[in-house]
Amino acid sequence: MTASPRPAEFSPADLAPIVGALRAAGCVFAEEEARLLASSARTPADLTALVTRRVAGLPLEQVLGWAEFCGQRIAVDPGVFVPRRRTEYLARVAIMLGWQAARPGEPVVVLDLCCGTAAVGAAVAAALDHAELHAADVDPAAVRCARRNVAAADGQVYEGDLYDPLPGTLRGRVDVLAANVPYIPAGEIALLPPEARLHEPRVALDGGADGLDLLRRVAAAAPQWLAPGGSLLSEVSERQAAAARRAVAASGLGTRVTSSSDMDATVIVGTRYGTLHR
């Protein structure tokens, strides 16, 4: 068996011009980025290619091919939505709900909707003793990436619009439905940093006129898919919280808002009334 090439070793002097180039391109954490890029390069030519892509404006995670999320290394392909650090809070809330739903000898059924890389689903499944993981996204590139990220959990990933591609056997069985829907108002897309605006799919960013179009669609059908006692949870901005809560409540779910000031994250939780029985 042929051993994989080892990363090249670069001295501080080698990295100095790279730090300068990254800083000139507007990278705030240029030193850290230079170290990460160097650790991913097999040869000096590789490093040059990586730096060129980063300086051109590609998100660091797409250049590296991975992002750290909840302590896991999540594969991120070019053109795929990059999991945000604030979304770790959504994953943590989902994990807590998964623990509460756990029953001896039975899996916690987890659905990661609008999954992107499936970072949330992968993190939740990794934290639970026994999870049955499903994920779905409309973007084919995201689906390919997600399948790699959930392989360790034996997760299933489906391609299609929201619930459309899901197997009917999931209806009424989902304990934790994490929907990381796009929630940026359409009129604010142009204000996003170029990294997101130019290199991530608009379908993963654009939430319609007020940013809540997708959440309304997800919430409207959620009761059909949730198990009794199961919960839908979704990330929104703080200023959208009241309207988002009304949208989820309109589907008949009991609602609450939870937030983390440290992570600048707001999550809407909607729970299907009833006792969890299987």
Residues covered by each model-derived region:
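Mobile active-site "lid"/loop adjacent to the S-adenosyl-L-methionine
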Residues: 181-214
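Conserved AdoMet
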Residues: 2, 28-97
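Non-catalytic nucleic-acid substrate-recognition regions in nucleic-acid-modifying enzymes
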Residues: 1-28
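Conserved Class I SAM-dependent methyltransferase catalytic core
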Residues: 209-272
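Conserved SAM/SAH cofactor-binding pocket of Class I
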Residues: 89-191
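Flexible, glycine-/basic-rich loop-and-beta segments that form/coincide
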Residues: 273-278
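Conserved hydrophobic residues forming the short capping helix/wall of the S-adenosyl-L-methionine
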Residues: 22, 98, 150, 222, ...
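Residue-level signal for inorganic ion chemistry
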Residues: 37, 57, 87, 120, ...
